[in-house]
């Protein structure tokens, strides 16, 4: 038994070392500075992936169930006012599903896009980093959009329109209640959106400096006239 345990511990240690070594080898052809940046970016993007996935699946499922339930209730309800309320609720829920399906949070994919560029040389490493930095900027913009007045105005506007249709068009007071619930749910969804990307980008820029365009520089040649001849120059 002790021999078995010793062998198991050795296997775990060697396995862990191999994983760490494999990570170093994968960036062995990158410069030290680029490799350090890559590790930071990839780690943060992957760290935010699980919550973004849970958030997306949770809200998509919530609105999907709401669409089905409200549609069934609308089809079986005999009262015209209540039926209108269910129809409006189904439409709003289906809108929520459509928005999430068409525009999922970028953080949901983690660093997957970076994996499409193998770090085979410094140029490829810089391209991989460029993609990662762009993902971080995109995630940060999506995080900041939680505070956009346009986003909150849209939540209020859509639910207000639904409330007016039901309450005024069908003389059904429950339309106002549905409006309030809809606004509340919309705000919870907005503020629970993956929110750490701004902090990640700020920390990255404080540690490494502002994000940079790592695309390869082009070499250009210049010719300028001089008295009695020409001057040649090269810019890179």
Q: Where are the language model's segments positioned?
A:
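Long, highly hydrophobic alpha-helical transmembrane signal-anchor segments
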Residues: 63-96, 100, 167-170
């Amino acid at each position: 038994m002790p021999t078995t345990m010793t062998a198991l511990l050795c296997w775990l240690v060697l396995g862990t070392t191999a994983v760490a070594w494999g990570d170093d080898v994968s960036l062995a052809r990158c410069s030290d500075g680029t490799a350090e940046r890559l590790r930071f970016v990839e780690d943060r993007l992957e760290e935010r992936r699980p919550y973004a996935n849970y958030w997306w699946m949770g809200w998509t499922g919530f609105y999907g169930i709401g669409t089905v339930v409200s549609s069934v209730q609308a089809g079986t309800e005999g009262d015209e006012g209540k039926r209108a309320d269910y129809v409006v609720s189904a439409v709003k829920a289906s809108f929520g599903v459509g928005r999430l399906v068409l525009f999922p949070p970028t953080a949901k994919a983690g660093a997957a896009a970076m994996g499409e560029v193998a770090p085979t040389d410094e140029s490829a490493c810089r391209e991989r980093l460029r993609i990662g930095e762009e993902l971080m900027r995109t995630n940060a913009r999506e995080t900041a959009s939680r505070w956009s007045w346009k986003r909150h105005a849209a939540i209020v506007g859509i639910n207000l329109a639904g409330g007016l249709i039901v309450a005024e068009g069908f003389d059904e007071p429950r339309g106002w209640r549905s409006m309030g619930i809809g606004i509340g749910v919309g705000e919870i969804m907005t503020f629970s959106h993956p929110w750490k990307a701004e902090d990640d980008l700020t920390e990255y820029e404080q540690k490494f400096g502002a994000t940079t365009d790592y695309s390869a520089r082009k070499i250009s040649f210049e010719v300028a006239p001089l008295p009695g001849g020409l001057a040649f120059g090269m810019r890179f």
